[in-house]
Curated annotation (Swiss-Prot):
Annotated protein name in UniProt: Large ribosomal subunit protein bL19
Domain of life: Bacteria
Keywords for the protein's UniProt record, in alphabetical order: Ribonucleoprotein, Ribosomal protein
GO biological process: translation
Length: 115
């Protein structure tokens, strides 16, 4: 039974996913359906959480838009994701950066990894 499920999941997995972690700044390009038109919308922010669960893997991206914090959760293998670009690598010590929700301005910055 396990092999059967694994084979089905492998059909739906994406192969071209870049390797990123919490603290990285990324741009996620998503397919948006408006009426009968399809277009690509970009969402740029910092990855504050990543959940690795095979086909159900997801990540949360946070950005500040007009002074308000906006978070969006994406499934990594979703067919609605067109592309994921890494803008810069962040240097953090924690896997979940939920403490950024209460920070504003300079205290919400993350050091850049030079590796």
């Amino acid at each position: 039974m396990n092999n059967y499920i694994r084979n089905i999941e492998n059909q739906y997995k994406k192969k071209n996913i870049p390797s990123f972690k919490s603290g990285d700044s990324i741009i996620v390009k998503i397919w948006i359906l408006e009426g009968e038109k399809k277009r690509i919308q970009s969402f740029e922010g910092i990855v504050i959480a990543k959940r690795n669960r095979n086909l159900n893997s997801s990540f949360t991206v946070r950005k500040i838009s007009n002074g308000e914090g906006v978070e969006r959760k994406f499934l990594i293998h979703s067919p609605n994701i067109h592309e994921i670009k890494i803008v810069r690598k962040g240097l953090v010590r924690k896997a979940k950066l939920y403490y950024l929700r209460s920070r504003i301005g300079k205290s919400a910055r993350i050091k850049e990894s030079l590796k």
